[in-house]
Every structure is written in C-alpha cells, then in structure tokens.
Amino acid sequence: MPQPARWTGHTRGTPGVSTSSCSNRGNTTDPTYLEYHDYYWGQPIYDSKELFKLMALESQHAGLSWLTILKKKESYEQAFYNFEPQFIAQMTEKDIDHLMKFPNIIHNRKKLEAIVSQAKGYLKIEKDYGSFSKFLWSYVNHQPINMGYKKPRDRKKVDQRATQLSKDL
C-alpha cells in the first residue's frame, strides 16, 4: 500500500509565517494545523479523490475539533486504503469491527460506517455524472465563491447551496 500523502494544494508561503494575520488560523501554533492552514485550507480542490478524502475526514470531525482529525489523518489513510473509494466500498461489518480497534482513529462505528457509505455514494456519482469533482463544483457554477467575510463571526451558519448539496448526496 502506498504511503499516506501529505496535503496537496497550492502553497501560500511558509507554514506559520506568511499568513499570521489570517483570522481563520486562530491562535494555534500546532505545526499540523499550521501546515493545513497555510497549504490547504481555502484552496480550491478539483481532484475527485482528494475531495472524497476531505469529505470522509469531515464526517469524522462532527463533535470534535478539526485539529483532532488532522492529527489522525495518516491513521485514517492507513485504515481506509489511502482513501481509495473502490476498496473502501467493499468493506464489510467485519472490517468495521477491525477498525474499532485500529490505533489513532475515532472508534465510533457510525462514523466509520459513514466512510464506507460515502465511498459507495462516490462511486455512484462517478458513474452517473462522470466525476465527483464536477458534481460538487456544479453547485457553485464550477468557481470558488468569495463570501466576503472579514471576520469568522460574520460567516453564515447555513448556505442554501450547501443545504441542497447535502440533500442530493
């Protein structure tokens, strides 16, 4: 199995240096979070498998800090075949039982089963629409949206496009 990949995406500079005034960075000095923030967060992603990985990790995030999940990313990559949907979709109850003991991942059966379900959905979308990425990006006319937020507190809690996408998924 290939080694877990580092975050892909476009660089915005040296981690922890170039974006120190960004309000989305928070007060953290954790190198894992700074690398994610400076190289990945806010960058458009068009690779279907990379989007699948992010969706799977986000599903583990519910009720936990994002830093908790970031620190477990490599373990999730090992546990879930480097986020290769065609392998994950074939996982069974027995595989989930094994993952409930796998080190350094969240041992919540429903969350682990969610990744398997997401892989099956990913494969269906790839078949029906030709690309998971194109399907997701179609909700925003294939362009990143600048919501114009100056401060984190200005962010909307709910966006109608996100609500519709959630329903469609």
Task: Map each language-model feature to its residues.
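HhH-family (HhH-GPD) DNA N-glycosylase catalytic core used in base-excision repair
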Residues: P2-L169
